[in-house]
């Protein structure tokens, strides 16, 4: 085999096929919180289809279910817990005044 044909041959590497994130028996519904919470980031954002490894139809149904759950207050729109956390080492003394006599 000459050199020009050899460059186009692909190496045959084996790969493990991942399980689909949604099985055929799972119902995509706004009440199914255990299923919906797998497709939301820590900040509360809907993860993309590439990250979720979903089909187009599944991603659309998941997005609709998440939005319905948000409207019905089952899910938060944003999850900003880190913003409100305070470190224990720094005491809060901004409002205290000491009188000097």
Curated annotation (Swiss-Prot):
First and last residue of the signal peptide: none
Keyword list, A-Z: Chloroplast, Plastid, Ribonucleoprotein, Ribosomal protein, RNA-binding, rRNA-binding
One GO term (biological process): translation
SUPFAM superfamilies, alphabetized: Ribosomal protein S18
Principal cellular location given in the protein's record: plastid
An example molecular function term from Gene Ontology annotations: small ribosomal subunit rRNA binding
A GO CC annotation given for this chain: chloroplast
UniProt keyword annotation of Membrane present: no
Cellular location(s): Plastid, Chloroplast
InterPro entries, A to Z: Ribosomal_bS18 (IPR001648), Ribosomal_bS18_CS (IPR018275), Ribosomal_bS18_sf (IPR036870)
Superkingdom of origin: Eukaryota
Family in the record: Belongs to the bacterial ribosomal protein bS18 family.
UniProt-listed NCBIfam families: S18
Subunit and interaction comment: Part of the 30S ribosomal subunit.
Name of this protein: Small ribosomal subunit protein bS18c
